């Protein structure tokens, strides 16, 4: 190999010397038309001896130079192979970090042993997490604390009821709040309906009206007992009222009767009858007013009014 390279080197040197000689001839050539003629035309001329050799040798020199370069590369590769094969080490990228380097250096058996404890550790961590979640779910449905349960049990025993009857009792209490306002809600008497056990004896308004006329009769009797005193005092004097609560309208009929008895009996009876009717009407009006005031809603009803 070395001898072949030494032989080819003088050939290349000879080619380079011929090329330089041609360049020098071209520079020495005077400015004539013969110098401007291309190389292939000069070769076709009858004077073939004058044909420049440099142009014809250029492609051969180029081919030889390419062959020499290829052979030099092949020789370098062969020399590298003769020196010895390079150790094939596993190329590790720096992005993977030191852990991957250590894994590459370790044999596969050790790697499998390492992977097994890691997998078991991950499984144990997952099972512990699931256990904690299950505990949280159980604690989420918070049962009734024992203190509250024990407090509700004695309450049921003191009432003499079974434990399941407590909601019914509470509902009954909520329903019994309504009859407290039965005397206020007069616009809708349908809402005041009660059960048979909760009803209380109510006094009918007709019975009250029937009792009302008796009160003026008692007052009239009291006034009649005082009539002789009024006669002694005289007709012009006013009769003192024994009871301040008694209205003055009740004092008029006896006086009118006495006045009417003096002139004549018939006229006095007519006047007294008309006055009694007027007095009864006025008393009835007063009674109606009192009843209307008593029946008025003192407090606005809390229950909704459906009209």
From Swiss-Prot:
Residue ranges, annotated region (Disordered): 42-153
Superkingdom of origin organism: Eukaryota
PANTHER family: CHROMOSOME 16 OPEN READING FRAME 86 (PTHR37867:SF1)
Composition skew (Basic residues), residue ranges: 129-139
Organism: Mus musculus (Mouse)
Lineage: Eukaryota, Metazoa, Chordata, Craniata, Vertebrata
Compositionally skewed regions (Basic and acidic residues) per UniProt: 42-52, 112-121
InterPro entries noted in UniProt: DUF4691
Name the record gives this protein: Uncharacterized protein C16orf86 homolog
């Amino acid at each position: 190999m070395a001898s072949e390279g030494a032989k080819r080197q003088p050939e290349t040197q000879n080619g380079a010397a011929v090329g330089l000689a041609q360049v020098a001839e071209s520079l020495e050539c005077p400015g004539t038309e013969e110098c401007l003629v291309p190389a292939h035309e000069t070769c076709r001329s009858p004077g073939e001896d004058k044909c420049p050799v440099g142009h014809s040798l250029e492609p051969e020199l180029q081919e030889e130079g390419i062959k020499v370069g290829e052979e030099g590369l092949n020789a370098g590769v062969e020399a590298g192979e003769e020196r010895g094969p390079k150790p094939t080490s596993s190329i590790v990228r720096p992005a993977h970090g030191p852990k991957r380097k250590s894994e590459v250096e370790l044999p596969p058996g050790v790697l499998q042993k390492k992977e097994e404890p890691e997998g078991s550790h991950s499984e144990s961590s997952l099972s512990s997490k699931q256990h904690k979640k299950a505990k949280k779910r159980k604690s989420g449905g918070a049962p009734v604390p024992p203190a509250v349960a024990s407090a509700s049990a004695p309450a049921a025993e003191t009432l003499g009821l079974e434990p399941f009857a407590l909601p019914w009792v509470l509902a009954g209490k909520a329903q019994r709040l309504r009859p407290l306002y039965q005397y206020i809600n007069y616009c809708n008497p349908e809402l005041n309906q009660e059960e048979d056990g909760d009803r209380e004896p109510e006094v009918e308004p007709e019975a009250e009206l029937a009792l009302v006329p008796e009160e003026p009769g008692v007052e009239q009797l009291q006034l009649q007992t005082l009539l002789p005193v009024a006669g002694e005092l005289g007709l012009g004097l006013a009769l003192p009222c024994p009871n301040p609560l008694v209205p003055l309208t009740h004092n008029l009929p006896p006086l009118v009767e006495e006045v009417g008895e003096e002139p004549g009996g018939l006229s006095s009876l007519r006047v007294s009858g008309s006055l009694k009717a007027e007095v009864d009407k006025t008393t009835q009006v007063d009674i109606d007013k009192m009843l209307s005031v008593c029946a008025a809603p003192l407090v606005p009803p809390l229950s909704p009014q459906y009209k």
